[in-house]
């Protein structure tokens, strides 16, 4: 039995949920997101809470209910507050520029690396070595941040590379003669 699935999803002011069969639409100040509920999951709205419950008492139904509850909670947070992910570029000559929906990275290759942001994700660079990604879709934001980090992941000896701002890179000692 999923402990996550038992907790209701709180709806803050300004967020509305529309149910149309198994299709759920969440509207807020930052946009609209929709989700198709799994067939083993039921959704009820009571006051300012969403309560999810499994159709049957099987392990699979509880599993899907927990997943749907987490996804709906992320949608509610996304359309009301939004999500943000910060990346740091550490290394000599490592720079980033944003132009529209394209990020140009100079990260030690012989050519600049260009990354086109997915729809719904925006980027800004307060400095040349910092990238801030914002979106109301947590999944797309995390995917974009992971792709950018993947161009030059932090290496363990000097710590150079692209890292999340809250990431701790475990450093290794150089080989001794």
UniProtKB/Swiss-Prot annotation:
Highest taxon listed in the record's lineage: Bacteria
UniProt-recorded name of the protein: Large ribosomal subunit protein uL6
Pfam families recorded: Ribosomal_L6 (PF00347)
Ranges annotated as biased composition (Basic and acidic residues): 155-177
Signal peptide: none
Record gene name: rplF
Quaternary structure annotation from Swiss-Prot or TrEMBL: Part of the 50S ribosomal subunit.
Family affiliation: Belongs to the universal ribosomal protein uL6 family.
